């Protein structure tokens, strides 16, 4: 999920969706889905996001509600899905699993007590991306002709490499780790109602007089998904130490500290596993009727819940009048 402390280092500015027309955005699919599941559609009534068999379908509502924003502004979304979990992340994954189990126990108790406020809060904390959520999301995206890329490891790393190659214009994610992966321009808050926030990699480095390697070193000192940080080191101290000592290893030596697998963690950000097995299409032709049938008939989503979203997708295909949208 990244280190939120990076926000204080990031060069951020507001940008209007109206200024993003014609751009291609590599969306961190798991991050995008998680945001919708925990903040956007998770708080509708339970009957609207589960089937009669108890299968969760909030992700499908999220896709139908979230894609129009791209289409209406003539933006091409490319959804990048995570691959294998890096072994260095195993401890973090286990920690989150244990925390989720704790919340699930508390959630059950809150339900038994009839505490709806507590239930709503804990419901989002117990959210996880099941195989069904991922598979049905992919199926719906394919029906809507939205490009999909399968990353060999971190989806965010793959998206950032695509941006550095010039194959896409932006990375779309809430995580600040996109900076560490070297994404030139990142759009945050793309699931929010308003305009997104632009995170500028080059401006971040320039503002703090850091190299890319030093920015990664700063993050490692603070702590990443792959390691615990050094106690007492936040953004300001990390930058100060790097200006004084030059790199991660010299800082650690000066402080008498050690971080396991520091070389590997650096490489995970500076040279992430990535594939070139993808295509960015010149045109997208969503099969809206098939997508609607998939969502409402096969997965039992209330037709009224997604009617406006499909209408907006249909309208945007007509209104753009450009080759990208057939």
Swiss-Prot record:
Record's keyword terms, sorted: DNA damage, DNA repair, DNA replication, Endonuclease, Exonuclease, Hydrolase, Magnesium, Metal-binding, Nuclease
Chain segments carrying region N-domain: 1-100
For region I-domain, the annotated ranges are: 118-246
Q: Offer an example of a GO molecular function term for this protein.
A: magnesium ion binding
The positions annotated for binding Mg(2+) 2 are 175, 177, 225
Which residue stretches belong to region Interaction with PCNA? 318-326
Q: Which residues bind Mg(2+) 1?
A: 28, 82, 154, 156
Q: What EC number(s) are associated with this protein in UniProt?
A: 3.1.-.-
InterPro entries linked:
5-3_exonuclease, 5-3_exonuclease_C_sf, Flap_endonuc, Flap_endonuc_arc, HhH2, PIN-like_dom_sf, XPG-I_dom, XPG/Rad2
Q: Does the keyword DNA repair apply?
A: yes
Pfam families from the xrefs? XPG_I, XPG_N
Q: Among its keywords, does the record have Glycoprotein?
A: no
Q: How does it assemble?
A: Interacts with PCNA. PCNA stimulates the nuclease activity without altering cleavage specificity.
What name does UniProt use for this protein? Flap endonuclease 1
Q: What is the species of this protein?
A: Haloarcula marismortui (strain ATCC 43049 / DSM 3752 / JCM 8966 / VKM B-1809) (Halobacterium marismortui)
Phylogenetic classification of the source organism: Archaea, Methanobacteriati, Methanobacteriota, Stenosarchaea group, Halobacteria
């Amino acid at each position: 999920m990244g280190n939120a402390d990076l926000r204080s280092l990031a060069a951020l500015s507001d940008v209007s969706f109206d200024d993003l027309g014609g751009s291609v955005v590599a969306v961190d699919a798991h991050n995008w889905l998680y945001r919708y599941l925990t903040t956007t559609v998770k708080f509708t009534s339970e009957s609207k996001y589960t089937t009669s068999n108890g299968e969760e379908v909030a992700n499908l509502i999220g896709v139908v509600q979230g894609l129009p924003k791209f289409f209406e502004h003539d933006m091409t979304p490319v959804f990048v899905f995570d691959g294998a979990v890096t072994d260095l992340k195993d401890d973090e994954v286990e920690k989150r699993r244990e925390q989720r189990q704790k919340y699930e126990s508390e959630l059950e108790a809150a339900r038994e007590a009839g505490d709806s406020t507590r239930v709503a809060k804990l419901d989002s904390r117990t959210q996880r991306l099941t195989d069904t959520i991922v598979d049905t999301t992919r199926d719906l995206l394919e029906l809507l002709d939205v490009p999909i890329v399968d990353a060999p490891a971190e989806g965010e790393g793959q998206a950032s490499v695509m941006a550095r190659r010039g194959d896409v214009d932006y990375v779309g994610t809430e995580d600040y780790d996109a900076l560490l992966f070297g994404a030139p321009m990142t759009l945050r808050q793309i699931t929010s109602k308003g305009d997104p926030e632009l995170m500028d990699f080059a401006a971040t480095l320039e503002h703090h007089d850091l190299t890319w390697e030093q920015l990664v070193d700063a993050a490692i000192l603070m702590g990443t998904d792959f390691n615990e940080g050094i106690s007492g080191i936040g953004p300001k101290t990390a930058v100060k130490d790097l200006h004084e000592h030059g790199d991660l290893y010299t800082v650690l030596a000066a402080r008498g500290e050690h971080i396991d697998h520091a070389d590997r963690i650096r490489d995970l950000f500076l040279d992430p596993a990535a594939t070139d097995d993808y295509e960015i299409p010149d045109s997208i032709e969503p099969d809206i009727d098939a997508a609607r049938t998939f969502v409402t008939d096969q997965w039992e989503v209330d037709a009224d819940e997604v009617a406006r979203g499909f209408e907006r997708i249909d309208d945007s295909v007509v209104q753009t009048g450009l080759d990208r949208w057939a």
